[in-house]
Amino acid sequence: MPSEVESTGREFLIGLLASMGLIADIEVGVVNENMIEFRVSGRDLGVLIGPGAQTLQAIQELLRTVIHYETNSSSGRILLDVAGYREKRKAALVAFTAKVAAEMVSSGERRAFEPMAAADRKVVHDAVGDIEGVSSTSEGEEPHRYVVLLPE
């Protein structure tokens, strides 16, 4: 992705952090040819994540909108991570999914998760793919869509 995307995103995040009185480091990396990731690290950044990562999702959407508007480009995905939250969340979801799947296999009854974001549902579906005797499906309508684990 062009450096214009990186500089525009970095400038937006620096301004946002400054307006909130936060000091942080910003690293930018190319995940693949269609995705760039902005990683924010520092102290006391929980306010950027918010309850249920809703603030993180909102900031990511603002970041994407600013980058696409300022660079006149709508190609490529923009990912924002704060303090390694996404990797920690993924590990927690995988562990929780394994626990719920084991309970479901023992009981033979389907198990429904609470509604979650599409990215979290994907993590759960991917984790279920590695568990024998369990399948998963998503049900409901956004923003109340949720994963259901089913015995095979």
Regions found by a protein language model. Name each.
Residues 1-152:
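RNA-contacting regions in translation and RNA-metabolism proteins
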